[in-house]
Amino acid sequence: MDVLIVDDSPVIRQLLRHIIEEGGMRVIGEASNGVEALRCIARRRPDVITMDIHMPVMDGLEASRRIMEEYPTPIVVVTASYSLGDAVTAMQVLEAGAITVTPKPQGPSHPDFERDVESLLRTIRLISEVKVVRRFRRRQGKREEVQPPPPVNHEHEGFQPGVIAIGASTGGPVALKELLQGISRKTPCPVLVVQHISPGFLTSFCEWLNQVSALPVSIGEYGERAERGRVYLAPDGCHMEVDRSCRISLVNGNRDETLCPSVSRLFSSVAKNFGRNAVVVLLSGMGRDGAAEMAELHRLGALTIAQDPATVVVNGMPGEAVKLGAARHVLSPPRIAALLNELPVQSCV
């Protein structure tokens, strides 16, 4: 696998080169800014690009836009900063077509170095398999028309959704943003979200969502009762569950767990405590986290929705749900929001 490193720091480029080559991949070039990156890509055509955000001449955002317009290539944003400003820029880079964001390893002497290295290498290997498409900039002021949603299919008497549970991973932040932008403030029940995201990035991600979401977004706290018309994100390193009174429970994950928080754990608690009176959604993501539990919820009669493969970055989680016959509807994020807006307001817990 051929990797291009784009970072304005020679020290970071050297560190990333060492990590990537020790991981069995080939570094085919280095660039200190976006202009150099575009020249290198035109000549060498890497399989994956690691992209810094802040660089002179051309930053990571503009470079990613240009790359996805001219030479579509899987991009992983590698950043050392989790400030709100950088979170907003990182989300814009994802909207431009980058696949995911991961932390820069902090040097061999740092206690989390080995974990960060393994996370970076795993991310590079995984995104190399993603089929990216050419992205063109949307004209300012031009909004996509959202088709009307399908009717909420009441297959049983007394459908009363008490909770909306959403699972997402790679590609999920942008999909979640699009969904939350379209959802009504009159949403009849709490919205609980498990989004796989790099450790340390969640607080800024939450603040970024609050800038675009129609509903207030916060990080769930142990013992908190989830309220209608609010969105709760699972915290870093904790599985989030919910009981039948919508009280949030947090369970610390083991350090060696690959997925924590887990969509499966959230969906299992929803199945146990709400059964048919739940709405569950799987957005873009690698793997199959939550798919089997969505199938069980579908069997119980819950309203189950998977993101349309035409709109996902990675069709792992929603695609697996569709394969299992677990998705009652397969929709784009704006149409998912439109469908959620059709839920009966009086059915709230």
Swiss-Prot record:
- NCBIfam families annotated for this entry? PRK00742.1 (NF001965)
Where does the protein end up? Cytoplasm
According to UniProt, the name of this protein is: Protein-glutamate methylesterase/protein-glutamine glutaminase 3
Q: What does this protein do?
A: Involved in chemotaxis. Part of a chemotaxis signal transduction system that modulates chemotaxis in response to various stimuli. Catalyzes the demethylation of specific methylglutamate residues introduced into the chemoreceptors (methyl-accepting chemotaxis proteins or MCP) by CheR. Also mediates the irreversible deamidation of specific glutamine residues to glutamic acid.
Q: Tell me the SUPFAM superfamilies matching this sequence.
A: CheY-like, Methylesterase CheB, C-terminal domain
Q: Name one GO molecular function term.
A: phosphorelay response regulator activity
Reaction(s) this enzyme catalyzes, per UniProt: [protein]-L-glutamate 5-O-methyl ester + H2O = L-glutamyl-[protein] + methanol + H(+); L-glutaminyl-[protein] + H2O = L-glutamyl-[protein] + NH4(+)
Write down the top EC class of this protein: hydrolase
Q: Name one GO biological process term.
A: chemotaxis
Active site residues per record: S169, H196, D289
| Entries under Gene3D superfamilies matching the protein | 3.40.50.2300, Methylesterase CheB, C-terminal domain (3.40.50.180)
- Similarity field: Belongs to the CheB family.
Which InterPro entries does the entry link to? CheB-like, CheB_C, CheY-like_superfamily, Sig_transdc_resp-reg_Me-estase, Sig_transdc_resp-reg_receiver
Location of the Response regulatory domain: 2-119
Q: Where is the CheB-type methylesterase domain?
A: 157-340
The UniProt record lists the EC number as 3.1.1.61, 3.5.1.44
Q: Which GO terms describe its cellular component?
A: cytoplasm
Q: What is its main location?
A: cytoplasm
The alphabetical list of record keywords is: Chemotaxis, Cytoplasm, Hydrolase, Phosphoprotein
| Domain note | Contains a C-terminal catalytic domain, and an N-terminal region which modulates catalytic activity.
Post-translational modifications reported in the UniProt record: Phosphorylated by CheA. Phosphorylation of the N-terminal regulatory domain activates the methylesterase activity.
Q: Which residues carry this modification: 4-aspartylphosphate?
A: D52
